[in-house]
């Protein structure tokens, strides 16, 4: 999946910029610049055509209805024809194709609900919340709870202290046993568990999330993620999941548990895996820094994101949440269908601060899980870059 490409980088945060050729990976020690950008968010916005910020209710619904049509078509074909296949081998071929296709389209719908949480679906907040709540509830995501924590992520991106998800640990806080999990077989196991269980574990137990010093969950109204006035929204989110659970229970009683697992359960696992893979690779790269409170600011932190190429078909299925993530972090209320045009315009201002990596996705995932184990500031960073940067943390993997 994905094309070939390169990411513009700086070595150790200073010195001449080295462009990698097509198909090449990042060499050891190569890093993006961590200097404060010489432009403002308003300058970036002025470079983008104004119509890119306009939300169209009709156009947004057209993407949603297209996804619903595909989900319905895949379901109809699987439920109506798969049991008629003449040879058992065809069953083993047909079901994985269905699971992947259905899970991929559901990921696109998940992305539309995510846009609703950013008020990027329409000009009407109520419409956005109703649409987002219905979609996310049907795929077991607590809409308002996630909307709140995700807003915090956008407000604190790349802060080693305050970011909400995929927060890297310093070396001193790595589990003692992790050094035994750096071999290839263990890494395969970790990737598998992360993709299949990572999303529900994050929502339920805040695994890989910001450390709050006590139990944290998207389902707990008293969780430190939420303010007292937001607790009612957590209850509403949970009610949506209870309603979905009851609906699935009734379906299982009518159709059978096996039927429900095949038609809904496995595609849901594929959806969860896609969400984890996409979001992890948007913010994780061996060349990326994290900042503590002495170095972090909003623009600097939100520029530590990378666009990736999943290929023209999957980029379209995922509504380009994959290859327009940089501009999404800068302008989260921009509708996804304007992201490509806005990215082209923004790159003229961003220059070397825009990051794109065309490494094939599975190769990139393997590299990131291997190289991005923990973060530490460089002992000689000040001497290398000409300024004290002890608040800048870089990925390492030697335990």
Swiss-Prot record:
Localization, UniProt: Membrane
Catalytic activity: a (9Z,12Z)-octadecadienoyl-containing glycerolipid + 2 Fe(II)-[cytochrome b5] + O2 + 2 H(+) = a (9Z,11E,13E)-octadecatrienoyl-containing glycerolipid + 2 Fe(III)-[cytochrome b5] + 2 H2O; (9Z,12Z,15Z)-octadecatrienoyl-containing glycerolipid + 2 Fe(II)-[cytochrome b5] + O2 + 2 H(+) = a (9Z,11E,13E,15Z)-octadecatetraenoyl-containing glycerolipid + 2 Fe(III)-[cytochrome b5] + 2 H2O
Motif Histidine box-1 per record, residues: 114-118
Membrane topology: Multi-pass membrane protein
Signal peptide coordinates: none
Keyword Oxidoreductase applies: yes
A cellular component annotation (GO) from this entry: membrane
GO MF term (any one): oxidoreductase activity, acting on paired donors, with oxidation of a pair of donors resulting in the reduction of molecular oxygen to two molecules of water
Segments for region (Disordered): 11-30
Protein's GO biological process: unsaturated fatty acid biosynthetic process
Tissue and organ distribution: Expressed in developing seeds, but not in leaves.
Ranges spanned by the short sequence motif Histidine box-3, renumbered to the chain: 325-329
UniProt motif (Histidine box-2) ranges: 150-154
Membrane-traversing stretches: 61-81, 93-113, 126-146, 188-208, 232-252, 258-278
Classification via InterPro entries: FA_desaturase_dom, FAS_N, Fatty_acid_desaturase
Keyword Transmembrane helix in annotation: yes
Main location: membrane
Enzyme category, top tier: oxidoreductase
Pathway assigned to this chain's UniProt record: Lipid metabolism; polyunsaturated fatty acid biosynthesis
Entry domain remark: The histidine box domains may contain the active site and/or be involved in metal ion binding.
Family: Belongs to the fatty acid desaturase type 1 family.
Protein name: Delta(12) acyl-lipid conjugase (11E,13E-forming)
Protein source organism: Momordica charantia (Bitter gourd)
Encoding gene, per UniProt annotation: FADX
